[in-house]
């Protein structure tokens, strides 16, 4: 029957020497040590030459290409940043100029509208002053007419009162002078 390692019963492992004595680990055997060092040196030199002549230049080229691409992208980004900064400065200058022009236009328009409003106000004041003067003249003439009518009415009323009280008709000049004296105060 086979054991758990697949060996036939009674067979020994390849590292065991006959009689139960173990042989040293093969790479450390004195007989093969020098040839193993030479083989190892040849393998490392061959691996170094292959990698330094074939693989490493490709890796270096890939790294250099990647570095150049990154540097190019950074340079392009810096150029675009400089252009955008210049555009921003130009925009700010134009914006400031536009604000100044808008302020000037606003001031000019305000002054123009104020001048027009002053002109209209003065014309309106002049018309109102003329109407007021006309109204005052009308009031004065109406007052004068009313006062002259009041004198006549007062004279007529005084004459009628004196006639009622005394039964005789008073002198018209005397009544007019009495009314005039009482109106003057």
Swiss-Prot record:
Ranges for region Disordered: 1-24
Membrane-spanning segments: 34-56
Membrane topology: Single-pass membrane protein
UniProt keyword annotations, A-Z: ATP synthesis, Cell inner membrane, Cell membrane, CF(0), Hydrogen ion transport, Ion transport, Membrane, Transmembrane, Transmembrane helix, Transport
Molecular function per GO: proton-transporting ATP synthase activity, rotational mechanism; proton-transporting ATPase activity, rotational mechanism
GO CC, one annotated term: proton-transporting ATP synthase complex
InterPro entries: ATP_synth_b/b'su_bac/chlpt, ATP_synthase_B_chain
Compartments reported by the entry: Cell inner membrane
Pfam name, any one: ATP-synt_B
Keyword Cell inner membrane: yes
Record-linked HAMAP family: ATP_synth_b_bprime (MF_01398)
Quaternary organization: F-type ATPases have 2 components, F(1) - the catalytic core - and F(0) - the membrane proton channel. F(1) has five subunits: alpha(3), beta(3), gamma(1), delta(1), epsilon(1). F(0) has three main subunits: a(1), b(2) and c(10-14). The alpha and beta chains form an alternating ring which encloses part of the gamma chain. F(1) is attached to F(0) by a central stalk formed by the gamma and epsilon chains, while a peripheral stalk is formed by the delta and b chains.
Annotated function: F(1)F(0) ATP synthase produces ATP from ADP in the presence of a proton or sodium gradient. F-type ATPases consist of two structural domains, F(1) containing the extramembraneous catalytic core and F(0) containing the membrane proton channel, linked together by a central stalk and a peripheral stalk. During catalysis, ATP synthesis in the catalytic domain of F(1) is coupled via a rotary mechanism of the central stalk subunits to proton translocation. Component of the F(0) channel, it forms part of the peripheral stalk, linking F(1) to F(0). The b'-subunit is a diverged and duplicated form of b found in plants and photosynthetic bacteria.
Family from the record: Belongs to the ATPase B chain family.
Protein name according to UniProt: ATP synthase subunit b 2
């Amino acid at each position: 029957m086979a054991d758990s390692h697949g060996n036939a019963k009674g067979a020994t492992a390849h590292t065991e020497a006959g009689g139960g004595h173990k042989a040293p680990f093969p790479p450390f055997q004195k007989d093969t040590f020098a040839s193993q060092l030479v083989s190892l040196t040849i393998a490392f030199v061959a691996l170094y030459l292959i990698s330094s002549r074939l693989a490493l230049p490709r890796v270096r080229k890939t790294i250099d290409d990647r570095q150049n691409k990154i540097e190019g992208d950074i340079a392009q980004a810096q150029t675009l940043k400089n252009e955008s900064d210049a555009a921003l400065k130009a925009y700010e200058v134009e914006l400031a100029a536009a604000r100044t022009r808008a302020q000037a236009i606003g001031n000019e328009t305000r002054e123009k509208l104020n001048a027009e409003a002053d002109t209209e106000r003065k014309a309106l004041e002049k018309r109102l002053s003329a109407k007021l003067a006309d109204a005052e003249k009308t009031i004065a003439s109406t007052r004068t007419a009313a006062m002259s009518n009041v004198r006549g009415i007062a004279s007529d009323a005084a004459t009628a009162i004196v006639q009622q009280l005394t039964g005789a008709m008073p002198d018209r000049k005397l009544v007019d002078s009495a009314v005039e004296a009482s109106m003057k105060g």
